[in-house]
């Protein structure tokens, strides 16, 4: 039941951080680190990260010691403990908890998975500038994050964090293989920065459905559709080495496929063009329009991360700690949404 989801997430988190094998796998040096009974240990360190308040380390250390019923803990001790803890521990906790979400809401029997990215600034420090290129305009090292999000059930499912600029299409293709994303009866939703023939091929090979917004010049066939004035048409694409020559991400050749192109007119009078492999009989044009509108749920999710979880206000100055913050923020967002959903009264059906 959804009112128990937040509780299940907390219990799963406790199980993981107390598990000896989990601790050894995600401790930077298991032969040396966290071998004494000194606090904070591995469980306390992992618990600290999503619960900190983006305040000074000294104040956070004081609050943490009080909450954890420890005599005292210094900011330096917390920093050292975080350095001993690998960021992948937070990614696994986030993914394990995301898998517990109840899929209460579907779209005609399908889960919806929206894929999108965001860019942000990192602390302007020499060590980070070596790994994360500095944006000439902002003057700060930049990161590029990508996530898969269930907009109907308001849950982040998987995510990646890289230096910016990164190729969004490559990141999206990697994200499709995440354990909470692959193998599901779902419709994948993509904005116009993602479409590529290689991505379409991967989705087709996975046997999954998709809706993508494309530019008017995405493919020659799409350009022809735009000029024709048609509103919903099947297009046959023959993709060969000559056409692929300028593509950064390569599809396996030869590749022949069919896509459906749909024209959507916005209230502003502007037009958008969507490609999909959903059948017209089951998903007429109005359903395709509705599906793409639902993709905006991930924008709402990112807005929450920026303005409520403060995802860009990192509490660490090192890459390992910054990635800890990132995945801990996603975990916290999911936990908050689960708690809110569980507290809401059931909807009363109208006669």
Where are these regions (language model features)?
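Single, function-defining residue in the core of a domain
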Residues: 1-55, 63, 72-73, 77-85, ...
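Short secondary-structure boundary/capping segments
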Residues: 129-130
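Conserved beta-strand elements of the Class I
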Residues: 111-113
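Extracellular beta-strand-rich solenoid/capping regions of secreted or surface-exposed proteins
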Residues: 133-134
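Short Lys/Arg-enriched helix C-cap and helix-to-coil transition segments
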Residues: 88-102
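Short alpha-helical "recognition helix" segments of helix-turn-helix
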Residues: 60-67
């Amino acid at each position: 039941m959804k009112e128990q989801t937040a509780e299940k997430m907390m219990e799963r988190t406790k199980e993981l951080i107390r598990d000896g094998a989990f601790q050894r796998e995600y401790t930077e040096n298991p032969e040396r680190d966290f071998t004494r009974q000194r606090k904070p240990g591995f469980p306390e360190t992992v618990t600290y990260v999503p619960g900190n308040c983006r305040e000074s380390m000294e104040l956070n250390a004081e609050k943490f010691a009080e909450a954890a019923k420890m005599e005292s803990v210094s900011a330096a001790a917390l920093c050292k403990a975080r350095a001993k803890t690998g960021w992948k521990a937070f990614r696994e906790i986030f993914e394990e908890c995301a898998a517990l979400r109840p899929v209460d809401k579907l779209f005609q029997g399908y889960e919806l998975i929206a894929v999108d990215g965001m860019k942000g600034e990192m602390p302007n420090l020499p060590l980070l500038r070596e790994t994360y290129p500095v944006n000439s305009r902002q003057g700060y090292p930049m990161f590029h994050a990508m996530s898969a999000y269930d907009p109907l059930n308001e849950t982040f499912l998987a995510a990646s964090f890289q230096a910016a600029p990164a190729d969004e299409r490559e990141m999206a293709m990697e994200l499709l293989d995440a354990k909470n994303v692959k193998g599901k009866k779902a419709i994948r939703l993509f904005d116009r920065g993602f479409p590529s023939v290689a991505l379409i091929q991967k989705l087709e090979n996975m046997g999954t459905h998709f809706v993508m917004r494309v530019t008017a010049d995405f493919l020659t066939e799409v350009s022809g559709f735009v000029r024709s004035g048609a509103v919903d048409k099947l297009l046959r694409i023959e993709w060969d080495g000559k056409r692929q020559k300028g593509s950064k991400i390569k599809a396996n050749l030869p590749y022949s496929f069919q896509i459906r192109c749909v024209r959507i007119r916005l209230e502003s009078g502007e037009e958008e063009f969507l490609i999909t492999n959903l059948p017209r009989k089951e998903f007429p044009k109005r359903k395709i329009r509705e599906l793409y509108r639902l993709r905006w749920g991930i924008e709402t999710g990112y807005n929450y991360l920026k303005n409520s979880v403060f995802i860009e206000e990192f509490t660490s100055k090192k890459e390992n700690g910054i990635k800890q913050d990132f995945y801990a923020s996603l975990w916290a967002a999911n936990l908050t949404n689960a708690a809110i959903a569980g507290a809401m009264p059931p909807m009363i059906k109208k006669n």
